[in-house]
A protein has these predicted regions:
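A glycine-rich (often HGG/GG-containing) alpha/beta subdomain
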Residues: 1-142, 146-150
Length: 153
């Protein structure tokens, strides 16, 4: 069985919003364990507002949570995104709670690797994701975007 992985998906620093992403078979159970107001029946792609809590039930931050059901996700696995305030402390505490609930810290590029291994991206598209992330001007961004969308220009 595949691991459930997690990482902070937004750059660290001060910001209005930060995202912790979880991908794998235990994503939904992790959502239910750290999202205090989580309903019994979670509707895929529905946005839920509530609070992230640690394993003692202490509130970490306000957040929205979104569950996306496999195979219709970037990675091809179940995915949950927790969107909270963009505080380094808040995001790290949410990630710590996610890991304590059964995920492991994702390796760099592992979400894209899983998308490739699950047939959601081909090799050219996986390389384009890296190029998009690293682009520093409009032209490389445009080329990588075209490559990701199937055009080799």
């Amino acid at each position: 069985m595949a691991d459930t992985i997690a990482a902070i998906a937004t750059p660290l620093g001060e910001g209005g919003v930060g995202i912790v992403r979880v991908s794998g078979p235990n994503s939904l159970s992790i959502m239910k364990s750290i999202y205090r107001e989580c309903p019994d029946e979670v509707i895929p792609r529905h946005v839920y507002y509530g609070h992230a809590v640690d394993n003692k039930g202490t509130v970490i931050d306000d957040m929205v949570a979104i569950y996306m059901k496999a195979p219709h996700t970037f990675t091809g696995d179940d995915v949950v995104e927790f969107q909270a305030h963009g505080s380094n402390v808040s995001l790290k505490l949410i990630l710590r709670s996610v890991i304590a609930s059964g995920a492991r810290l994702a390796d760099p590029g592992e979400f894209t690797k899983n998308a490739f291994l699950n047939g959601r991206l081909d090799l050219s598209q996986a390389e384009a994701v890296i190029d998009l992330i690293k682009s520093r001007s409009e032209k490389p961004l445009s080329i990588a975007s075209d490559q990701l969308n199937g055009s080799l220009g």
